[in-house]
Amino acid sequence: MGSCARLLLLWGCTVVAAGLSGVAGVSSRCEKACNPRMGNLALGRKLWADTTCGQNATELYCFYSENTDLTCRQPKCDKCNAAYPHLAHLPSAMADSSFRFPRTWWQSAEDVHREKIQLDLEAEFYFTHLIVMFKSPRPAAMVLDRSQDFGKTWKPYKYFATNCSATFGLEDDVVKKGAICTSKYSSPFPCTGGEVIFKALSPPYDTENPYSAKVQEQLKITNLRVQLLKRQSCPCQRNDLNEEPQHFTHYAIYDFIVKGSCFCNGHADQCIPVHGFRPVKAPGTFHMVHGKCMCKHNTAGSHCQHCAPLYNDRPWEAADGKTGAPNECRTCKCNGHADTCHFDVNVWEASGNRSGGVCDDCQHNTEGQYCQRCKPGFYRDLRRPFSAPDACKPCSCHPVGSAVLPANSVTFCDPSNGDCPCKPGVAGRRCDRCMVGYWGFGDYGCRPCDCAGSCDPITGDCISSHTDIDWYHEVPDFRPVHNKSEPAWEWEDAQGFSALLHSGKCECKEQTLGNAKAFCGMKYSYVLKIKILSAHDKGTHVEVNVKIKKVLKSTKLKIFRGKRTLYPESWTDRGCTCPILNPGLEYLVAGHEDIRTGKLIVNMKSFVQHWKPSLGRKVMDILKRECK
């Protein structure tokens, strides 16, 4: 190839500079929008042609070249045979180095009117421009097509003709800028060395962001095809019909240069071979343009067309080649418990377009949009950072004493500290024992003790101590006694004493229910059915814990069923209380309340008798009918 061709290639480099290589912020570190290096996409790949000179047998061919005054030189003729390297003119010759092999070319068979040259790529590439250097006269008509689906469908890039209107019915871009047809590269001169140039970034695309959807539609290709539709003769060819037939009826091309780059959406500056692709063995393949991007900006895919697995917190975008903005993918906040996440547009919109990442398959017993909490059955170990694989520990709840999730057989605990939710009456961090005052650990929890204090957690038997005295099994049978005291018992004034402990030494007058008028005349504040639970010796007085089982009457104080304290006032110098209240027994008690303190008082004016249903009915009748 001559100096003209070399200058043409240098000019092609300026086209590159005006195209993708002019992206703002291109740097080796790809800090902003970036693009891989440009190169000849035909290098290392197979170019196809319909025919080849000498494909089946040796052929004779001739060609003209003109002088500077356009007069013809003597034609030169030679032989071609595709089977012999020194006589072959194969399609691969169009893709070798124009500088190292300037005298190599492809040539079609003789007498061919239509020919096709095609480049098939193994992936999507960005195509920027085409340079075709002809050895034969340029065609009178040709079409440049591209495919973006590996040859399934084709679209025209440009039509070339000496007369666009007559040949294709199209306007000429020499007359109307931007027209799809041109007559600029269809002159038969020069008879050899004529070029055809197409720039994919011609107006109106040359001012666009090179990674916008509009420009991608223009630049992306998987296949490129040139259809040579009409030959034309060199104008200096002689027309002497008496001469022997000359062999000029063929197409011949020195170079077929397809300039482009790996297609990476502005997110890579280097590419590697596509998996499984094997380059054609030919000179110059060291400079081959590969098709798989080495993605930056937290992107992934052969063309950096989506975000990396853990970087989907915002929607993927191509880089902006006009401003240089990289539009990096952003990491999802998965707290170290997920390997991937996905973008959810609903989450994105709900957050005000701030965060749309949802973590996938949370690991280490976590769950949630960000794997931000321990899943049911596990709790947060505050001694470990939450990003640690063992930050969520399994709940250790007792299977019998702990509650379970509704419609679930799995026990759970407080995810913040591991405390288990216990069944009624059950205690312990693991819910593995009865609370104090409860017994009978089982499937339904624990039952309340029938005592004022604690009881045996297994049997429910009341447990006595020197301060809380449970006498359920120790009190003597109730016997009516008279009001005649036994000889005095010497004791220190400061010493407290429980009448219940020494009830046998107290002689109290037996009470009977007299007439209704006398009962009503006492104007009792309360009338209760109670069960005596225990007595507490306070030193200066006695407190009796009872369980109120029924409220027959209450006045100013609101009295409810349940545990309550009675305060006996009858305190002799021997420490006896009357009337006697024996633990474990049920009584009907009518007494007065201390308005100032709210205490329920029991004294000699109180009415106390063992509970009988008949007694209860009789007192209720008196309260309703007589005590008005």
UniProtKB/Swiss-Prot annotation:
Single GO biological process annotation from the record: substrate adhesion-dependent cell spreading
Q: Name the InterPro entries on file.
A: Laminin/Netrin_ECM, Laminin_N, LE_dom, LMN_ATRN_NET-like_EGF, Netrin-4_NTR, Netrin_domain, Netrin_module_non-TIMP, TIMP-like_OB-fold
Reported tissue expression: Expressed in kidney, spleen, mammary gland, aorta, heart, ovary, prostate and fetal spleen.
The reply to whether Glycoprotein figures as a keyword in the UniProt entry is: yes
Q: Where is the Laminin EGF-like domain positioned along the sequence?
A: 262-331, 332-394, 395-448
- Its GO CC terms? extracellular region; laminin complex; plasma membrane
* Gene3D superfamilies assigned: 2.40.50.120, Galactose-binding domain-like, Laminin
Show the GO MF annotations. laminin-1 binding
Instruction: Note the superkingdom of the native organism.
Output: Eukaryota
Q: List the transmembrane segments.
A: none
Which residue positions does the secretion signal occupy?
A: 1-18
Q: Which residues form the NTR domain?
A: 506-627
Cited SMART domains: C345C (SM00643), EGF_Lam (SM00180), LamNT (SM00136)
- Disulphide bond pairs: 262-271, 264-293, 295-304, 307-329, 332-341, 334-359, 362-371, 374-392, 395-413, 397-420, 422-431, 434-446, 506-576, 520-627
The protein's matches in CDD domains, at most eight in alphabetical order, are given as: EGF_Lam, NTR_netrin-4_like
Location(s) in or outside the cell:
Secreted, Extracellular space, Extracellular matrix, Basement membrane
Domain Laminin N-terminal intervals: 30-261
Arranged from A to Z, the UniProt key words for this protein are: Basement membrane, Disulfide bond, Extracellular matrix, Glycoprotein, Laminin EGF-like domain, Repeat, Secreted, Signal
Q: What is its main location?
A: secreted
Q: Is Coiled coil included in the keywords of this UniProt record?
A: no
| Quaternary structure and partners | May form a homodimer.
What does the protein in this record do?
Answer: May play an important role in neural, kidney and vascular development. Promotes neurite elongation from olfactory bulb explants.
Q: What is this protein called?
A: Netrin-4
Q: Could you tell me which species this protein originates from?
A: Homo sapiens
What taxonomic lineage is listed for the species of origin?
Eukaryota, Metazoa, Chordata, Craniata, Vertebrata
> What would be the name of the gene that encodes this protein?
NTN4
